[in-house]
């Protein structure tokens, strides 16, 4: 049902951009230049994280669907992995590239102060901007002509490394214990630490140790100290 899909996507986006961003929108309407730097980053990156995966899904995963359904399904699949975990297709039938794209979206999550999990949009944005600054030989990291403090960059790097270590470590252990493909187990651990809920269908058959690993990852991913504002 297109209407149901659109409503769910709208609610996911509304809940995933954060309360402070909505305060900016309420107070400043559509005057983007008046927004806080964080709101500008969140809204800009959110658009990118919706459009780029949707284009990939449209051309490479859903090419056998009618045009209208293809567009809607591609958009839905690019929106839902970062927070809600609703699913309208069998993810196990995705190509490995499609599964990896979904996995990265689950790890990224939504905005700070939102209902979304993951390492947060701002964490990823700070790290990408910092990497570009190093590549371009700039001394400081900037967003929208404002400097990002070194402390913020360090905090983002710490959270990123923690997420990657837990996600990969948990995935490797589960893959070894359960004798399943590494990508499949990494998908499950990304879903757990991102507090998303999507699955390739392997979680229902894993043993108690693997279940405990996933539970711990969910608890860590849902704790306030595991993300940066």
What do these predicted regions represent?
Residues 1-228:
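Membrane-proximal intracellular helices of multi-pass ion channels
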């Amino acid at each position: 049902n297109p209407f149901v899909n659109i409503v769910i996507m709208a609610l996911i986006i509304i809940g995933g951009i954060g309360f402070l961003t909505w305060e900016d929108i309420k107070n400043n309407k559509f005057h983007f230049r008046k927004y806080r730097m964080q709101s500008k980053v969140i809204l800009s990156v959110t658009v990118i994280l919706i459009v780029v995966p949707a284009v990939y899904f449209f051309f490479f995963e859903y090419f056998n669907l009618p045009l209208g359904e293809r567009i809607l399904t591609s958009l839905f699949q690019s929106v839902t992995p970062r927070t809600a975990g609703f699913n309208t297709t069998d993810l196990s039938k995705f190509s490995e590239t499609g599964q990896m794209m979904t996995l990265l979206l689950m790890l990224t999550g939504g905005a700070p102060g939102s209902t979304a999990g993951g390492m947060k949009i701002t964490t990823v944005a700070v790290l990408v901007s910092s990497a570009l600054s190093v590549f371009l030989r700039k001394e400081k990291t900037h967003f929208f002509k404002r400097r990002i403090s070194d402390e913020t960059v360090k905090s983002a790097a710490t959270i990123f490394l923690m997420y990657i270590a837990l996600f990969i470590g948990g995935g490797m252990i589960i893959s070894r214990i359960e004798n399943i493909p590494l990508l499949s187990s990494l998908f499950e651990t990304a879903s757990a630490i991102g507090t998303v809920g999507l699955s390739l269908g392997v979680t229902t058959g894993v043993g108690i140790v693997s279940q405990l690993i996933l539970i711990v990852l969910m608890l860590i991913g849902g704790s306030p100290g595991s993300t940066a504002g």
